[in-house]
């Protein structure tokens, strides 16, 4: 008969967030089991990382180890860290252990799931690539997202990352009946708080009826120990998997920032006694990244589409952390400071953003040729800008002048009013279907709208709205 009594051990060594714990003979916990340590400030949860031999294990703490001392009692819970899942998590903020941290009381969840789970079996995967329509023109036309794919979001501070994220959360709920999970991994606490406040303001989180909210938030911020930052991504992913597998929904999983996940792993790695690899990163970098990324996928039941903010240290794309991330991405959305300065929002760079989905075999020749033509027009405009700056527009050939005029219209038509920004801008948000977006850009490229003023294309939804705006400008 299996004994149900939990084995207890004691702390023998403390090095920062890493603890060595001795257990009685034959009662060692398994790797990834959660351990509870009694400290003066309450209970600390740790996760077993290594079995050292000699009846000792090495574990990483999920919270601060200040005030701990050798000899403190440790209890093996007999299972990995488990977190609440389901609709009751919507509108709430959790920490890495799945405990609510928003002062709104406990979460009454019907079920919990362990954060370490295998990726879906190959037989359950959805193999046919399909486009995930976001309702945002520039994304759907030029760098479309794959349903169940992974998208890298690149952009500095203040170029509109947060607003873009909130718009995507809003659109997946309205157009796809889906929900979102936001994993804040090692970012600023202030930003986490701002995001929460903005979500309440734009009704992404419904304070009056939390279950009608469109997002669950999981935070492991910069001030947390590396153990929490290393695992908070898995906590968010586990909540997203429940919506996909049990509720059979389309889910958006945001990870901000995927670099901090790697960084936390490298902080812990040396303390666990592993030899560092290139640039001081952990030797298990690719394995850790793969274990997280392979669980983000489309199954026959539902999908998890993940949007990951990628910080590139010192703008070095060959750094092992971003380089390992790139291997998993299906699309990149690059936000440009130049476009933001011109007031073109979303400030997505149409020439730098890429997608593996933009192939005639997947999106169709109509979409593909329109996208390529839009890009080549914008590229030609970019090349001509130096000449225009020195000599002026009048010195260009007739053909180039026409290209510039159309490119400026395209640039403005790539902007769009967002639902979540209504509160700040006063102009109602627009969801533009892919079909309407393609139609609009084709009309501009064919020259059907050459006589319309370029201002008519700025911050509108579909092309009909631009034509109406031009008519009202005449009046």
Swiss-Prot record:
Q: Which Pfam families would you find in this protein's record? A: ATP-synt_ab (PF00006), ATP-synt_ab_N (PF02874), ATP-synt_VA_C (PF22919)
**Record's InterPro entries?**
AAA+_ATPase, ATP-synt_VA_C, ATP_synth_F1_bsu, ATPase_a/bsu_AS, ATPase_alpha/beta_chains, ATPase_F1/V1/A1_a/bsu_N, ATPase_F1/V1/A1_a/bsu_N_sf, ATPase_F1/V1/A1_a/bsu_nucl-bd
Name of this protein: ATP synthase subunit beta, chloroplastic
Q: Where does ATP bind?
A: 155-162
The EC code for this enzyme is: 7.1.2.2
* Entry function: Produces ATP from ADP in the presence of a proton gradient across the membrane. The catalytic sites are hosted primarily by the beta subunits.
Subunit description: F-type ATPases have 2 components, CF(1) - the catalytic core - and CF(0) - the membrane proton channel. CF(1) has five subunits: alpha(3), beta(3), gamma(1), delta(1), epsilon(1). CF(0) has four main subunits: a(1), b(1), b'(1) and c(9-12).
Q: Which gene encodes it?
A: atpB
The alphabetized UniProt keywords are:
ATP synthesis, ATP-binding, CF(1), Chloroplast, Hydrogen ion transport, Ion transport, Membrane, Nucleotide-binding, Plastid, Thylakoid, Translocase, Transport
Give the source species.
Porphyra purpurea (Red seaweed)
